[in-house]
Amino acid sequence: MAAEMDWDKTVGAAEDVRRIFEHIPAILVGLEGPDHRFVAVNAAYRGFSPLLDTVGQPAREVYPELEGQQIYEMLDRVYQTGEPQSGSEWRLQTDYDGSGVEERYFDFVVTPRRRADGSIEGVQLIVDDVTSRVRARQAAEARVEELSERYRNVRDSATVMQQALLAASVPVVPGADIAAEYLVAAEDTAAGGDWFDALALGDRLVLVVGDVVGHGVEAAAVMSQLRTALRMQISAGYTVVEALEAVDRFHKQVPGSKSATMCVGSLDFTSGEFQYCTAGHPPPLLVTADASARYVEPTGAGPLGSGTGFPVRSEVLNIGDAILFYTDGLIERPGRPLEASTAEFADLAASIASGSGGFVLDAPARPIDRLCSDTLELLLRSTGYNDDVTLLAMQRRAPTPPLHITLDATINAARTVRAQLREWLAEIGADHSDIADIVHAISEFVENAVEHGYATDVSKGIVVEAALAGDGNVRASVIDRGQWKDHRDGARGRGRGLAMAEALVSEARIMHGAGGTTATLTHRLSRPARFVTDTMVRRAAFQQTIDSEFVSLVESGRIVVRGDVDSTTAATLDRQIAVESRSGIAPVTIDLSAVTHLGSAGVGALAAACDRARKQGTECVLVAPPGSPAHHVLSLVQLPVVGADTEDIFAQE
């Protein structure tokens, strides 16, 4: 019988141990039992969560928001298996101190705590809050992104080539929401053979995920040829079976393409029928509107060159149903048997779809974006990954009705149209950059129509219409009943607005007639696919709350502008710049970070200010972060613009 340990002699006196535990600067937590009740916390933990009475409470009751973020699943695994686990820069969202839910990042180690007989009584954690480190890196990455051309030149050429060969975006269509993520393997950042595609064809949407055997530049070259061949067949109107048969014949001319796998699916927008073929590829995961998840039946088709043919199966997708295509890197993860890994993928996707899992602060995002990004992040961060991972997700939705606005040709018409158009474009799922471009073009059209209306009769009004077609194009028009108004040659800003509108959208036309003027635009909508090298940490995109009311704050040598700068507010800004700069004699900085719309009249005022400063030998510095409406427009008209730190843009608000 083993002698009982002399704790005081072996470990130290209880009071000394407690005092040392208390003063260790790292967060230390002891949990007990299968419900992970808090039994010990040190001063560092209490300083981290000062208002929470945790000792004696189950962890899930103290931090309920963490349910579904995979931290409790990790604690369960350590308690059940006795195997230590760790996490690096895990993003966790919960109420840490009673002040509301917030997002922080952590490094941690979880280890089992055993009784004298070897059985596990609980787990303990060593935790380091690394939020400051992560956010500093995010800020640095944002600055690198601002210098994107220089950054691209120093990146690995194979990675650059692969991203150039992959689909950079997914379409926006009336009957479905789509999202895509591509994760580059941490230990092999060279190009690989994974790819995805989404093609909007009017009456149907075709989704593709494929995987070529091998890695590196050779695999990427094979992938690009197969992707192009399949796109050509699908775009030409061939069925899933016909397209795959053609690619199977073509692959014989492409060394290294044998045994490539593909999953191709076609959604009929009207009926919801989803026809698919799993050509040697893992079957898609179907997540229904009521948040149940199951894998669809494989079709029995083999990879390219297998000679099995390409039989198809069909599912009917209801409104709210989602389908997830993926490559094997998602389910073949280190330390997980394939059966357990596939079940974990389905369970996690179902919990995120139901709202019980995932990140609570991500809720404002589109459901399909949360399903795609949260699933990828939460699934992989506890195991890591050895291969590139592609995840392409689509959720069927009811189409948004077309937009129709009729209003009088008054000075506030453009502002009214911008507000309604922004809301409609956001509802159909347009990306913020497309929203800015279309809103800008239509606003210029409306302002021209107002001038026509003032020349005749305001009550004749303006009609604005917009609709999203099944091919992913928005078609919009502005119709007025006024007469075209000529402008004096050389008048500042005249003619610039229509030229800018034509440059911002895919196609624009203006037709004049005796009964008025019709301005139309066509613009293909897309949302960027997300390419990442680290699933733990996502880079924050530029975001701004839409407050279109024009406000300008004048400080010493600095003007901060917010809201819409259009034909009704540009004159105010012009006067403020002239006064603050003393007509160009004094240097001035104009912060346009919070500008929601920069029309041609505003561009004219800024161009004039820069011209005055240049003539006087001083500076007029325009500030706007990359991705903002002002930065986009100023880059288009080639006015020099300086980026800003997006974390500080709204600090004073």
Curated annotation (Swiss-Prot):
Q: Which InterPro entries match?
A: Bact_Sigma-Reg, HATPase_C_sf, PAS, PAS-assoc_C, PAS-like_dom_sf, PAS_4, PPM-type-like_dom_sf, PPM-type_phosphatase-like_dom
The record, for SUPFAM superfamilies, names: ATPase domain of HSP90 chaperone/DNA topoisomerase II/histidine kinase, PYP-like sensor domain (PAS domain), SpoIIaa-like
Annotated Mn(2+) 2 binding sites: D211, V212
Pfam families found in the cross-reference section: HATPase_c_2, PAS_4, SpoIIE, STAS
Could you tell me the keywords of this UniProt record? ATP-binding, Hydrolase, Kinase, Magnesium, Manganese, Metal-binding, Nucleotide-binding, Phosphoprotein, Protein phosphatase, Serine/threonine-protein kinase, Transferase
Phosphoserine: modified positions: S600
Provide the binding site for Mn(2+) 1: D211, D328, D387
Reaction(s) catalysed (UniProt annotation):
O-phospho-L-seryl-[protein] + H2O = L-seryl-[protein] + phosphate; O-phospho-L-threonyl-[protein] + H2O = L-threonyl-[protein] + phosphate; L-seryl-[protein] + ATP = O-phospho-L-seryl-[protein] + ADP + H(+); L-threonyl-[protein] + ATP = O-phospho-L-threonyl-[protein] + ADP + H(+)
Cofactor field: Mg(2+); Mn(2+)
Show where the PAC domain sits.
86-142
Supply the EC number(s). Answer: 3.1.3.16, 2.7.11.1
Could you tell me which residues belong to the region Anti-sigma factor kinase region?
397-544
Read off the CDD domains from this record. Answer: HATPase_RsbW-like (cd16936), STAS_anti-anti-sigma_factors (cd07043)
Q: Could you name the domain of life of the organism this protein comes from?
A: Bacteria
Residue ranges occupied by any STAS domain in the UniProt entry: 546-653
Q: Describe its PTM?
A: Autophosphorylated.
Q: Which PROSITE patterns match?
A: PAC, PPM_2, STAS
Disulfide bridge partners, by residue number: none
Q: Any idea which GO molecular function terms this record carries? A: ATP binding; metal ion binding; protein serine/threonine kinase activity; protein serine/threonine phosphatase activity
Cofactor stoichiometry and binding remark: Binds 2 magnesium or manganese ions per subunit.
Chain ranges of the PPM-type phosphatase domain: 177-396
Describe the task this protein carries out.
Primarily acts as an independent SigF regulator that is sensitive to the osmosensory signal, mediating the cross talk of PknD with the SigF regulon. Possesses both phosphatase and kinase activities. The kinase domain functions as a classic anti-sigma factor-like kinase to phosphorylate the anti-anti-sigma factor domain at the canonical regulatory site, and the phosphatase domain antagonizes this activity.
Name recorded for this polypeptide: Multidomain regulatory protein MT1410
